[in-house]
């Protein structure tokens, strides 16, 4: 968003790096840069919000130079699989269009022309990360979270319940994270 670009510019200015970094507002499925512009495309736990993950990866391939790498982590459906109702519950709460699987990401990367170097399932530790999120929400960021949601304690309780559900799904291997690195 324009707001995020402005924030990023402030941060790069503060670090004295504004001359080395150029930013453009764009769409990950239509990246506003020419072919072979980058040596790295990177993402962190955000591609779960993208509807057309195939197009995202194809665009990454397009803007990468030969030998360039794509590296990302993302929230995924775990190897134990989610039922339709479990997937719907997590996707609705998190506002995901859907979650890919690790094997699904491998296929998307290969179909786009990438050679996979790393495909790690990080699900085993994911439940502990969610536990930490819950602890932070209930012990450290309670005031800030309540402020964001208009001090609605009922909604705050519902949010906590959804996070506990996600933790349960992660402990069962149904919901997790992956790390992927591939080369063009």
What name fits each language-model region?
Residues 1-30:
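Class I SAM-dependent methyltransferase SAM/SAH-binding core
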Residues 29-41:
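A short acidic, Gly/Pro-enriched loop at the edge of an enzyme's catalytic core
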Residues 39-52:
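A short SAM/SAH-binding and catalytic strip from SAM-dependent methyltransferases
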Residues 54-69:
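A short glycine-rich, Lys/Arg-flanked "PGG" loop and its adjoining helix->strand segment in the class I
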Residues 75-96, 109:
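Short, glycine-/aromatic-enriched active-site segment of Class I SAM-dependent methyltransferases
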Residues 97-119:
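Short alpha-helix
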Residues 112, 134-139, 174-184:
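Core SAM-dependent methyltransferase catalytic element
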Residues 123-173:
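C-terminal helical/coil "lid" or tail adjacent to the Rossmann-like core of SAM-dependent
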